């Protein structure tokens, strides 16, 4: 409920220059009496001529928005806004309330009264309700139905909790170990030196570890394949497999850092400006060793990150500290609000009982206006207020009922509650004086919490753990190992409809795939892509069946078919440290983070066009990004600022979800599902979860991880189905190489475009690839590195030989052809131009390059 205090100008409230004041009749005879009566008449007559064109004037003089007339709700206290209205007829898809109000049919018996008289939730109507297939009743005394999958899932969804009764104990499978807490974990986690049960019960009564014949035992007791020893890639957490003692040589030197970076003692590179900034960024904290003292002067403010700023910058409304601590807990406004306080015009704050007491308590005597004390302005035209007029000792204030707010100090307008983030779990419908929450297809509202929960199989988290890939259920918390004996998994995604996992291995410089069945059995690993310098992030296009990845060493973003047979570098410029990547094939856009200098989050079409920057300010180390397709938002983690933030998919409406040095010391990857956000933190070696709107309800799901890097939610609703336009009318859209979704910028945008491999260009039909451009091949080779160069070298040799043969043949032909020489310079010029054009049409080594991608299919073509 909001109000507006009116003071001083009474003519605005009452419609006349005399106002509604109490007049003392002076000794001036009949003339003064006539003037007083004239003013009183003006005040009374003016009450009927106050409404604007966009308002409706009630019979009692009140003004209400014109849209409220004949809407079935009496807004004028005399009912005049609902008189002489044509009777409204409800649609067939509506439920007719007893009062005649219309509400959507789907709202009846949903546990939330939508009719003003509550008739859509009446016991007579709802007690006959029959639960649908795959639903169960919450009991004979309840009209509530919930999905079968919510039964015994650890959360009380029925009002009285009947769905969590008589559940019995969870029985672990033969391949699992039962923790003391009742949690089920993989037997391979038992006695592995890590507390996977979270209560330590999986590490009790463990015999000294022994490794197999073909294994090497690290000093930390971990076993690794013997072939991994002394291969210049540390697989033991203590690096004992690459030690001088084991290998007889010094470990391979760490990668060289650029001039704008410094090298950590643990080998990685960080920005030079992060050295000695008070915040450890290296894994071993070496960037904060041997740093000068960071003591601020007495006239300075010390930021939480250790930086010093001038004291005058604290609480000046500008974030001068990188972490914003100079603007925290600021309160520059003198509080003088509430019904018991009065703000003097001279600035003082006094008690309301001192107003109009014939004593000047304000310096300027503004608490004792002789002509305004004890005048009830609400008696005339309700003070000009559309709803509530509240008389005050001096002046009056307009107020609104719940669900409304003042739009012009007098008129109440509907509050659009849907503008508040998180007010609804998914869909928010703004109503007059309120709002209604609904869920997207595939979700159902939990009436106990208001959260839209997924219907169907239990959602789970799948995450990398360097040498294996693990899964934990979000309801029953079953914790198992999916893929084992990996080298160094750094990125992960899935094609959920096809039940396939995809991961990138940093050590093997490759991307792999494997099928996963309903029993969590993983099939044979298939290497689909090779020659990737430093894979940082991968994203699967589940509709068009392609895979996108970032390469932090080659500074590229590429795409390939899921079988790896066709690949293409989409971006190889203006990338510094490309990291996480996400795709939305429904709209044809992809998103990625880049923590280079300057750090940013970018967006582009999945075909490599329409590149744009989304986030460029207050961002330093954006590691993980994730899309919330239900709410159309992008979330990201900043490992330097220790923040979890979000923006809409156009880079607007930025919100800070969580800032925490405790839970976000070095976050790496995140994923979104329902109302929750889940992330991996590398420093804490844990998986956390929190509310995606508020950052509250923090929980720890997994502890004691080993260099975990990426995480996804595995559930069919994460990847909504859509049309593959590349297979709509022609195989592969008629493209001779890759068919890629185009960004849906407007209704005229193409649905897809074709693209060609390095060295080739699209012909005029926009479908076939032709020609050969050696410069683009060189760029592709540079992007792939030495291994890629060897793969492309035979092609270059063949092309070179073909070109040499062609020029030898053409030279022989010229020598054996009779020629005529004309001295006419005009003719000579013309024939030379014609010759150049002819060669350009038939030669494969032309200098002209056609556009890489051409429009193929649009909505208009489908009509």
Swiss-Prot record:
Residues 49-87, 88-128, 129-169, 170-208, 209-249, 255-293, 294-332, 334-373 form the LDL-receptor class A domain. SMART domains: EGF (SM00181), EGF_CA (SM00179), LDLa (SM00192), LY (SM00135). Glycans are attached at residues 169, 773. The chain crosses the membrane at residues 786-809. One of its GO terms (molecular function) is calcium ion binding. Disulfide bonds join 51-63, 58-76, 70-85, 90-102, 97-115, 109-126, 131-145, 138-158, 152-167, 172-184, 179-197, 191-206, 211-223, 218-236, 230-247, 257-269, 264-282, 276-291, 296-308, 303-321, 315-330, 336-349, 344-362, 356-373, 378-389, 385-398, 400-412, 418-428, 424-437, 439-452, 726-739, 735-754, 756-769. LDL-receptor class B repeats lie at residues 457-498, 499-544, 545-587, 588-631, 632-674, 675-717. GO terms for cellular component: clathrin-coated pit; plasma membrane; very-low-density lipoprotein particle. PANTHER family: LOW-DENSITY LIPOPROTEIN RECEPTOR-RELATED, LOW-DENSITY LIPOPROTEIN RECEPTOR-RELATED PROTEIN 2-RELATED. This is Very low-density lipoprotein receptor. The gene is VLDLR.
């Amino acid at each position: 409920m909001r109000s507006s205090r009116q003071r001083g100008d009474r003519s605005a409230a009452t419609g006349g220059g005399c106002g509604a004041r109490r007049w003392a009749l002076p000794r001036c005879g009949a003339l003064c009496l006539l003037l007083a009566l004239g003013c009183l008449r003006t005040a009374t007559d003016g009450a009927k001529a106050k409404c604007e064109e966009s308002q409706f004037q009630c019979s009692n003089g009140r003004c209400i928005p014109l849209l409220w007339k004949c809407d079935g709700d009496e807004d004028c206290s005399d009912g005049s806004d609902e008189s002489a209205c044509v009777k409204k007829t409800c649609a067939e898809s509506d439920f007719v309330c007893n009062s005649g109000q219309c509400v959507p049919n789907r709202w009846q018996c949903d546990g939330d009264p939508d009719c003003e008289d509550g008739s859509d939730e009446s016991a007579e109507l709802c007690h006959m309700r029959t639960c649908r297939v795959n639903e169960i009743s919450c009991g004979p005394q309840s009209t509530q139905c919930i999905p079968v999958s919510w039964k015994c899932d650890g959360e009380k969804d029925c009002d009285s909790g009947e769905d969590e009764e008589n559940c019995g104990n969870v029985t672990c499978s033969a391949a699992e170990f039962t923790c003391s807490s009742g949690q089920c974990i993989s037997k391979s986690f038992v006695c592995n030196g890590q507390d996977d049960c979270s209560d330590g019960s999986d590490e009790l009564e463990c015999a000294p570890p022994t490794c197999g014949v073909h294994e090497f035992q690290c000093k930390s007791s971990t076993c690794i394949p013997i072939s991994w020893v002394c291969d210049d890639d540390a697989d033991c957490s203590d690096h004992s497999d690459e030690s001088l003692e084991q290998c007889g040589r010094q470990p391979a030197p760490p990668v060289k850092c650029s001039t704008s970076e410094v090298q950590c003692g643990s080998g990685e590179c960080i920005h030079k400006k992060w050295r000695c900034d008070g915040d450890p960024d290296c894994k071993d904290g070496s960037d904060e060793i041997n740093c000068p003292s960071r003591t601020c002067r007495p006239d300075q403010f010390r930021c939480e990150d250790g930086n010093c700023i001038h004291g005058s910058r604290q609480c000046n409304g500008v974030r001068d500290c990188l972490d914003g601590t100079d603007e925290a807990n600021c309160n520059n406004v003198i509080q003088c609000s509430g019904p018991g306080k009065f703000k003097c015009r001279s600035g003082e704050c006094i008690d309301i009982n001192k107003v109009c007491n014939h004593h000047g308590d304000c310096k300027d005597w503004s608490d004792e206006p002789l002509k305004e004390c004890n005048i009830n302005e609400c008696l005339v035209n309700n003070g000009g207020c559309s709803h509530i007029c509240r008389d005050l000792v001096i002046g009056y204030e307009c107020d609104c009922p719940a669900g409304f707010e003042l739009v012009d100090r007098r008129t109440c307008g509907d509050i659009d509650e849907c503008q508040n983030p998180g007010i609804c779990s998914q869909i928010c419908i703004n109503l007059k004086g309120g709002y209604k929450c609904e869920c997207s297809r595939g979700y159902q509202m939990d009436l106990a919490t208001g959260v839209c929960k997924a219907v169907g199989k239990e959602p789970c988290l799948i995450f990398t753990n360097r040498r294996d890939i693990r899964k934990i259920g979000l309801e029953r918390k079953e914790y198992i190992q999916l893929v084992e004996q990996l080298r160094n998994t750094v990125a992960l995604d899935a094609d959920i409809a096809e039940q396939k996992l995809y991961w990138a291995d940093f050590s093997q410089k490759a991307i792999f795939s494997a099928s996963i069945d309903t029993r969590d059995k993983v099939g044979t690993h298939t290497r689909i892509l090779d020659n990737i310098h430093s894979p940082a992030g991968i994203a699967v296009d589940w509709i068009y069946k392609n895979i996108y990845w970032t390469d932090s060493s080659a500074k590229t973003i590429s795409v390939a078919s899921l079988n790896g047979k066709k690949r293409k570098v989409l971006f190889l410029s203006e990338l510094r440290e490309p990291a996480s990547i996400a795709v939305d094939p429904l709209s044809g856009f992809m998103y990625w983070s880049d923590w280079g200098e300057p750090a940013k989050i970018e967006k582009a079409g999945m075909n490599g066009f329409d590149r744009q920057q989304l986030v460029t300010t207050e961002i330093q180390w954006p590691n993980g990004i994730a899309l919330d397709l239900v709410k159309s938002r992008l979330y990201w983690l900043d490992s330097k600022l220790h923040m979890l933030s979000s923006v809409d998919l156009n880079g607007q409406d930025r919100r800070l979800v969580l800032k925490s040095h405790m839970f976000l010391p070095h976050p790496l990857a995140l994923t979104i599902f329902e109302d929750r956000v889940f992330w991996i933190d590398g420093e804490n070696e844990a998986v956390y979860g929190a509310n995606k709107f508020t950052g509250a309800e923090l929980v720890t799901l997994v502890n004691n991880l080993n260099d975990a890097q990426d995480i996804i939610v595995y559930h069919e609703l994460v990847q909504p189905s859509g049309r593959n336009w590349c297979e709509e009318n022609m195989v592969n859209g008629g493209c001779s190489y890759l068919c890629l979704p185009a960004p849906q910028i407007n209704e005229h945008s193409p649905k897809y475009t074709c693209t060609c491999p390095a060295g080739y260009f699209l012909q005029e039909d926009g479908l076939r690839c032709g020609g050969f451009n050696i410069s683009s091949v060189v760029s592709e080779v540079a992007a792939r590195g030495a291994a890629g160069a060897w793969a492309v070298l035979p092609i270059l040799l063949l092309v070179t030989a073909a070109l040499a043969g062609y020029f030898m043949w053409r030279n022989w032909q010229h020598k054996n052809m009779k020629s005529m020489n004309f001295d006419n310079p005009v003719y000579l010029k013309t024939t030379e131009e014609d010759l150049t054009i002819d060669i350009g049409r038939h030669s494969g080594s032309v200098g002209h390059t056609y556009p890489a991608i051409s429009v193929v299919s649009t909505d208009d073509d489908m009509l």
